[in-house]
């Protein structure tokens, strides 16, 4: 590896020397006919939309100027009415939420009881078997202890 000569190749890049601002010069030097037609078509549409936006803004300002005194005059009625409507909507929504919570709780309880009633006979049989096994175990231990007491009593008589 060390005895091989190493070569460096340089490839110059052309055409990327400076930034042109995203505009490429065309052969004709001016905008194309398609671009001119697009601008001419967009000007009336844009102007119309701008005029409609101005009319809408003017109408909104005039409407606000006309209705502001009415809002001030009727505010003793409107504010409590808005509060009542807000409370009614809030109570309706909370009633629905509590109703859904109650239904889901009831569904859970019924499902729990259904599962418990299906497993109850099996659990009762298991408990019965455990009690019988425990009674047999206690009886066996009682016999063993009784025999142990008898054997010790007989040994005590002999001595």
Swiss-Prot record:
Which GO biological process annotations does it have? lipid storage; response to freezing; seed oilbody biogenesis
* UniProt cross-references to InterPro entries, sorted A to Z: Oleosin
Where does this polypeptide localize? Lipid droplet; Membrane
Region entry Disordered: which residue ranges?
1-24
UniProt note on tissues of expression? Expressed in seeds.
Would the keyword Transmembrane helix turn up in this protein's UniProt record?
A: yes
Keyword list, A-Z? Allergen, Lipid droplet, Membrane, Transmembrane, Transmembrane helix
Q: Where are the transmembrane segments?
A: 45-65, 70-90, 92-112
Q: Does the keyword Membrane apply?
A: yes
Per the record, where are the segments of Polar residues compositional bias? 1-10
Predominant localisation class: other
Q: How does it sit in the membrane?
A: Multi-pass membrane protein
UniProt GO cellular component terms: membrane; monolayer-surrounded lipid storage body
Q: Which family does it belong to?
A: Belongs to the oleosin family.
Q: Which function does this protein serve?
A: May have a structural role to stabilize the lipid body during desiccation of the seed by preventing coalescence of the oil. Probably interacts with both lipid and phospholipid moieties of lipid bodies. May also provide recognition signals for specific lipase anchorage in lipolysis during seedling growth.
What is the protein name given in its UniProt record? Oleosin Cor a 12
> What is the organism lineage in this UniProt record?
Eukaryota, Viridiplantae, Streptophyta, Embryophyta, Tracheophyta
